[in-house]
């Protein structure tokens, strides 16, 4: 699978533009796991190339079991009907010079796209990293996901180096 690595250097605190009717909170309890899995599977189901379906055990093993997991690192966007419409997680990737914050699994429901939810979630994640003293955010996305690549470029992420 060809993966694009992108990064953004933050030169000032990120500006968070709120979305009308959307509230963001952090992971609260086990009820969030089922809603998150549903969101991820819905958001990525038509991706080309496709992403395999996630399960609740996947969430517990790949998200919650991560060494730096805290509820504060998972951002959940809800609409006025309390439906989960978007999510992003902040993870830390280890490197020789210490941990680096990474944007992980940004997802927005297809019927809630182009409303500014993804942009707001990215800004909130960047703000959380900024408050912890980090000035660069990295991410990986599949090279075939053109819409994702266009979005990340629009919010200031630049290509690093492709890997296999």
Per-segment meaning from a language model:
Residues 1-21:
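Acyl-donor-binding surface of acyltransferase catalytic domains
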Residues 23-38:
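A short beta-loop-alpha structural element at the N-terminal edge
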Residues 44-63:
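Conserved GNAT-fold acetyl-CoA-binding loop/helix
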Residues 71, 93-103, 113, 132:
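A conserved beta-turn-beta hairpin within the catalytic core of GNAT-like acetyltransferases
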Residues 76, 83-92, 100-102, 107:
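Conserved beta-strand in the GNAT
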Residues 108, 114-127, 131, 150-154:
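Conserved acetyl-CoA-binding loop-helix of GNAT-fold acetyltransferases
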Residues 110, 139-149:
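Conserved beta-strand-loop-alpha-helix junction that forms the acyl-donor binding cleft
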Residues 129-141:
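Conserved GNAT acetyl-CoA-binding A-motif
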């Amino acid at each position: 699978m060809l993966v694009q690595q992108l990064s953004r250097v933050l030169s000032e605190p990120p500006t968070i533009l709120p979305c009308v009717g959307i509230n963001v909170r952090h992971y609260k309890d086990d009820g969030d796991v089922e809603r998150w899995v549903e969101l991820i599977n819905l958001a990525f189901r038509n991706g080309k190339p496709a992403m395999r379906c996630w399960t609740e055990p996947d969430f517990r093993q790949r998200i919650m079991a991560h060494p730096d997991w805290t509820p504060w690192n998972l951002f959940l966007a809800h609409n006025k009907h309390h439906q989960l419409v978007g999510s992003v997680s902040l993870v830390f990737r280890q490197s020789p010079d210490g941990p680096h914050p990474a944007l992980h699994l940004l997802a927005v429901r297809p019927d809630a796209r182009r409303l500014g939810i993804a942009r707001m979630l990215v800004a909130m994640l960047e703000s959380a990293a900024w408050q912890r003293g980090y000035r660069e955010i990295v991410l990986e996305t599949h090279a075939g996901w053109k819409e994702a690549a266009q979005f990340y470029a629009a919010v200031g992420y630049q290509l690093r180096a492709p890997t296999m």
